[in-house]
Swiss-Prot record:
Enzyme class, broadest EC rank: transferase
Entry keyword tRNA-binding: no
Source organism per UniProt: Sulfurovum sp. (strain NBC37-1)
Keyword list, A-Z: Amino-acid biosynthesis, Aminotransferase, Histidine biosynthesis, Pyridoxal phosphate, Transferase
Cofactors: pyridoxal 5'-phosphate
Annotated positions of the N6-(pyridoxal phosphate)lysine modification: K225
Source organism, top-level taxon: Bacteria
Protein name: Histidinol-phosphate aminotransferase
């Protein structure tokens, strides 16, 4: 069978290793596995969400409200925008897919930082587009504008806070990049971890309303991180109505499940779970910073729910990741991104205790 030629240059996305894999390969009991690889919320599921799922388990045979009216209403109140400014996806990943399919072809190019979310490249390559990267993982105005003028990309991706590095770009710098490009280039501002950045430093906080005046900008958000709904797959894009209307032409019917829709609506009602998640994170990440300093390890200042450790020539990220995996500790090796480092989700106090104990033994 002959497949589309563009597939020859696409690598399959590699998700964080699941607990089940460690159980199968190393015979470690599930309760003894500590997964700090996928930036999941360590608190778990909001009890209010669990209640909604249990109360509605008997309607799984019904299709959801395809207009997603209640969720759009909830998001419009949350972000002070109109329903017509919102598109819902099965995770913000799906909105990225809509964007690529709507705008890109084999004559297009896209611009992103040297190290950033892998799905930008994958979705662009699926459409045959060329990938342009800046020199650094940081979203620097000079680098982006120079590349923009050289290549005239159809899409610019600004992931802030950035995954997998954890750094953030200031609101001022983001707006400067946006205002430095013309309206034929779409700027995607991916705020998947924005709740963490906003809690740490308002200078790096970006709200959808900061961007809505630009006709060529879309803001992406998700319920997967601070809201703890990674397994429910709900994300959204917020932009001017004209852009949203065009993206809707890419959306399949019933792209959000009935239960996912209901729990996302519930998640918008109360911020206490998000606040508790961020409070735990802010408390525990200090331990990772202290541990790194005490052990001579470099790290990138994080505005997310994870931290990135960078190693010198005396340590190897692949060897460390593999050794920890055999001990039942799952972290994300960044070798595939060209970095000698690892990304570690900030867990609970108990999970972090386990990580520090095993990591110290491995590096010694």
């Amino acid at each position: 069978m002959k497949f589309n030629k563009v597939l020859e240059n696409i690598q399959t996305y590699e998700a964080g290793k699941p607990i089940e894999l460690v159980v199968r390969e190393f015979g470690i009991a599930p309760k003894d596995v500590v997964k700090l690889a996928s930036n999941e919320n360590p608190i778990g599921t909001n009890p209010a969400i669990t209640k909604v799922i249990r109360s509605n388990a008997d309607i799984a045979h019904l299709y959801p409200d395809d207009s997603m009216f209640e969720l759009k209403e909830a998001l419009s109140r949350k972000f002070d925008v109109e329903d017509e400014n919102i598109i819902i996806g099965a995770g913000s990943d799906q909105v990225l897919e809509f964007i690529s399919r709507a705008l890109l072809n084999e004559a297009s190019s896209v611009l992103m930082s040297a190290v950033t979310f892998a799905m930008y490249e994958i979705y662009a390559k699926q459409m045959g587009a060329k990938i342009i990267r800046t020199e650094s993982y940081e979203h620097k105005y000079d680098e982006f504008i120079e590349a923009y003028h050289t290549y005239k990309p159809k899409i610019i991706y600004i992931c802030t806070p950035n995954n997998p590095t954890g750094d953030a770009t200031s609101r001022e710098e983001v707006l400067k990049i946006i205002e430095g490009v013309d309206k034929d280039t779409l700027v995607v501002v991916d705020g998947a971890y924005m709740e963490y950045a906003a809690a740490k430093d308002q200078k790096h906080a970006i709200a959808p309303t900061d961007l809505l005046k630009y006709e060529n900008v879309i803001y992406l958000g998700t319920f997967s991180k601070a809201h703890g709904l990674g397994g429910m797959r709900v994300g959204y894009g917020i932009a001017q109505a004209k852009l949203i209307k065009e993206l809707y032409k890419m959306r399949p019917p019933f792209n959000i499940t009935t239960l996912s829709l209901l729990v996302a609506i519930e998640a918008c009602k109360d911020d206490s779970f998000v606040e508790a998640s961020i409070a735990l994170h802010q408390e525990q990440i200090k331990r990772y910073e202290t541990f790194a300093k005490e052990n001579g390890i470099s790290y990138i200042e994080s505005y997310t729910n994870f931290i990135t450790y960078l190693f010198d020539e005396n340590l190897d990220s692949t060897q460390i990741s593999d050794a920890l995996l055999k001990r039942g500790v799952i972290i994300r090796n960044l070798a595939s991104y060209g970095m000698n480092g690892v990304r570690i989700t900030i867990g609970t106090e108990v999970q972090n205790d386990v990580f520090f104990r095993h990591f110290a033994e491995v590096i010694s």
